[in-house]
Amino acid sequence: MASAALICGTEQWKALQAHVGAIQKTHLRDLMADADRCKAMTAEYEGIFLDYSRQQATGETMEKLLKLADAAKLKEKIEKMFKGEKINSTENRSVLHVALRAPRDAVINSDGVNVVPEVWSVKDKIKQFSETFRSGSWVGATGKPLTNVVSVGIGGSFLGPLFVHTALQTDPEAAECAKGRQLRFLANVDPVDVARSIKDLDPETTLVVVVSKTFTTAETMLNARTLKEWIVSSLGPQAVAKHMIAVSTNLKLVKEFGIDPNNAFAFWDWVGGRYSVCSAVGVLPLSLQYGFPIVQKFLEGASSIDNHFYSSSFEKNIPVLLGLLSVWNVSFLGYPARAILPYSQALEKLAPHIQQLSMESNGKGVSIDGAQLSFETGEIDFGEPGTNGQHSFYQLIHQGRVIPCDFIGVVKSQQPVYLKGETVSNHDELMSNFFAQPDALAYGKTPEQLHSEKVPENLIPHKTFKGNRPSLSLLLPTLSAYEVGQLLSIYEHRIAVQGFIWGINSFDQWGVELGKSLASQVRKQLHGTRMEGKPVEGFNHSTSSLLARYLAVKPSTPYDTTVLPKV
C-alpha cells in the first residue's frame, strides 16, 4: 500500500509536524500563566475531572489534533466498534468488550446477532453459582464449604482481574462482602508461583478456577494440572468435580480434564484477552470473592464511560482527549514512554494491567492494511503508586529523560486515617504530593531561584530543574467498584483511540506467537535430553551453550515422580 494512505500522509498530520517547532519554543511556566488556557484544558464526567493543562500543548494544538481525529475517521471507527463490525481484520473478529457491561436491554450485534442476551445469560449463571458458593450450599468433597479461590490464567486472564481485585480489597463495601474469603491468582508457569498461590491453603476448602478459552494455553494448563494433582493427592480423583471449575468454550477438553461442563462459563471470540476482565474471566472469580452485586457496580461504572466515549463531543471526551494527547507525545514530540502514577495504594496493580493493555494493543510496526509505518506508535508503560514512586524513579522523570506522566488521585480515601496532633490526615499528606508533583515537573527550578536561596555555586547545576515536563491529572471522587470500572474503561478506550488514529490494529497480538513456537522446539530438546540422553542440536551456538549449561545440572527429582511445591 502506498504511504499516502497512511495517516502520516495527510495534511492534518503534516500541520501538526509543522506545529512542533512552535511548541518546542514554549515553556510550561509560560503556558500555565494563561488562566483561560488552563480552564479550557479540562473535562469532567460524573465527578471524574481531567486537567491536561500541563501538557506541552496550546489551544491551537488541540484544534489540530481534533482535525487529525477527523482525518483518521475516528468517529466512524468508534461507531464500527460499537456496532460489532469486524474491525479486528487480521483475525476477522468483532471487538465487543463494551457488550460485556451493556444494560440487559441493549442491542449490540456481531454477525447480525444481538450478543447482549447471551452475555447476560452467562452473567445470570455466574450470579446464581456465586450465590450458591458464597452461601455455603456448594461444598467440597469432604462436605466443607469452600472459602478460598485460586484463579489460574495468564496475560489478560490474570492482570485485569488482579487489578480489580486489588482495588476492591480495601473498599469498605467490597471488603465487608469478602470477609472470611481469599482470592488468589496463579499465572506464571514458574513453580515458585504455584507454591505462593497455595501457601497455607487447604485443598478441602479451595476452589480452583481454570481460565483458558481453548483449554490449551500451555502455561495455564500446566498450572491447572499441577493444582489438580494438589487436590487429588489430598482428596482423591473424585474431588476434581467439586473443587475445579472453568472459564472456557472448549467443553470437550473441560470434560476430559475432569471438570463438569455445567460448571464451565463461556466467553467469546469477540473478546480479546486483555479486554476480558468484564467477561467471565474476571466476573466469575470476583463474584466468588465479593458477590455479584459488587461486581455489577464495577460493570456499570465501565458502561457509564462506554456511553460517555460513544456520545460525548471529542472536545470534552475524556478517553478521546487522552488518546489524542498520547499520539501527540509519542509521534510528534518523540516521547517513547508514559508513567502511570496513581496516588492510591489500592491502584497498585493498575500500571501492570495498562502495561499489557497498551503495549500489546499498540506495539505494532505496520498499519491495519499491512503497510510499514514511518512513524512511532505505542508507549513503554510503567508506574508505581505515589508516594512510593517518588523514592524510586521520579529522579529520572525530574532531571533525566522527559516522560509524560498520568497522575491519578482520589478525593475520598477508602481507609481514612487522622491522628490527633498531626497537621493533616494521612490522605491529605498523600494528596499534597499528588498536587505538588505535576507543578514541580512543569515549572522546575531555575539557577536564578537557587542563587536567591544562597545555594552554593557548585551545587547549582545539580539542583537545577529544567521543568517543561508534561503531565496530566485525573481526579476521581472516590474509589468504589463503580469508579474502578470507570477507570478501566477510560484506559481501554484511550488506547483504542491511539490505535484508531495511527491506523493500526489494536486488537490482535501476533508478536507473542514467535516466542511460543521457538519455546516448543526447546521443550522437545529438554525432554529428549532428560529422558533419552539426546545431544543438544538444531540451535545457534549461543543457545546451544546455554542449554548445555542448564542440562548439565541434573534435576533433584526424577521425571517420573510427582512432586508438589512446599513452602
UniProtKB/Swiss-Prot annotation:
CDD domains tied to this protein: SIS_PGI_1, SIS_PGI_2
Enzyme Commission code: 5.3.1.9
GO BP field: gluconeogenesis; glucose 6-phosphate metabolic process; glycolytic process
Catalytic activity: alpha-D-glucose 6-phosphate = beta-D-fructose 6-phosphate
Localization: Cytoplasm
Keywords: Cytoplasm, Gluconeogenesis, Glycolysis, Isomerase
A Pfam family it matches: PGI
Pathway noted in the entry: Carbohydrate degradation; glycolysis; D-glyceraldehyde 3-phosphate and glycerone phosphate from D-glucose: step 2/4
Active-site positions on this chain: E360 (proton donor), H391, K516
SUPFAM superfamilies in alphabetical order: SIS domain (SSF53697)
Gene Ontology molecular functions: carbohydrate derivative binding; glucose-6-phosphate isomerase activity; monosaccharide binding
GO CC list: cytosol
Keyword Isomerase found: yes
Subunit field text: Homodimer.
Sequence similarity: Belongs to the GPI family.
Record protein name field: Glucose-6-phosphate isomerase, cytosolic
